[in-house]
Amino acid sequence: MRKHLLTLLAILAAAGIGYRFGQTTTARAASGRVFEIRTYTAEPGKLDALHARFRDHTLAIFKKHNMTSVAYFAPTDEPRSKDTLTYILSFPSRDAATKAWVEFRNDPEWQKVSKESEANGKLVDHVDSVFAQATDYSPLK
């Protein structure tokens, strides 16, 4: 009987630790700093206009909405060098990212810039977005 009781207690303790670890991981994922890695594929012939829009307008609007620019990249090898822009944003949390994107999309300045920059056709064919957290060994946290 005592052996069964000890076994039951061990199972319950392991389940409790596992549950608590899962809560910690989930809470950290919801509230810890996150990075969003976004890759834009431009419409044919529109990459220069896309770079100009980011350079001249988008970064300032990001800043206004607490969207921290980490880095912007242009591929060096074809064919991606002809149509791709990749960048990384940082947010205090996933919830903050969601809120910032809603505010950004509803910003009258962004809506004006977007409309004007696409007067001769849309600039972006599609966007790929991935949210990530820095690993414990990453130099960038």
How does the language model describe each region?
Residues 4-5, 17-21, 25-31, 52-70, ...:
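An amphipathic, aromatic/His-enriched active-site/gating alpha helix that lines ligand/cofactor pockets
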Residues 9-16:
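Hydrophobic membrane-insertion alpha-helices, especially the h-region
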Residues 10, 132-135:
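Short beta-strand-to-coil "C-cap" segments at the C-terminal boundary of structured domains/repeats
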Residues 35-39, 86:
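Active-site-flanking beta-strand signature of metal-NTP-handling nucleotidyl enzymes
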Residues 42-51:
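Short, surface-exposed ligand-recognition loops at beta-strand->loop->(often short) alpha-helix junctions
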Residues 45, 75-80, 93-96, 135-137:
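Solvent-exposed loop/turn segments at secondary-structure junctions
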Residues 140-141:
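Soluble, non-membrane globular domain cores that form compact, hydrophobic packing
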